[in-house]
Amino acid sequence: MESETLTPGETVTILDTEFCKIGVAICYDVRFPELFRNMTLAGAKLILLPGAFNMTTGPAHWDLTMRARALDNQIYFAAVSPARDTEGPYQAYGNSCVANPWGEFCGRTDARESIVYAKIDLDYIEEIRNQLPLLKHRRPALY
């Protein structure tokens, strides 16, 4: 299990680029939506997440969690995975993807070695947030 092998970090990583603020996390982090909400509130518009879900968690959770993190925060969420090596000791799910602020995939691969290309439209983030102002309607005093 990942939590038995890796040590958790102590800080949130957000890169301030000329394009936008980019949050960076790793595989197991995707299970904690609060992390990505904090990144979003700090101004992140894109999250990059390398991950290597296996053939149990991948089919059940990969698409769902990546789309949910994008939708919940109305951001772009790019998750990259190793290609599946059927001869290797670890069977990665693969399926690298980019989800948009509406929770749809705008770039996706399968389990083979490949490259994902996706358009990251920062104006689309604002369009979605204006249509459905989730961040403005939060009630942090209640929860």
Outline where the language-model segments fall.
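Active-site catalytic loop in hydrolytic enzyme cores
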Residues: M1-A42, M55-L64, A68, Q131-L134
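Structural beta-sheet core signal
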Residues: V24, F77-A79, V98
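Short, Asp-centered acidic motifs that coordinate Mg2+ and/or phosphate
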Residues: L46, Y76
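Short secondary-structure boundary segments
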Residues: G51-A52, V80-A83
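Short gly/pro/ser/thr-enriched loop/turn and capping motifs at secondary-structure boundaries
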Residues: N54-T57, D85-E87
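Aromatic- and carboxylate-lined catalytic core of secreted/periplasmic carbohydrate-active enzymes
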Residues: N73
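C-terminal beta-strand edge segments of enzyme domains
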Residues: P82-Y143
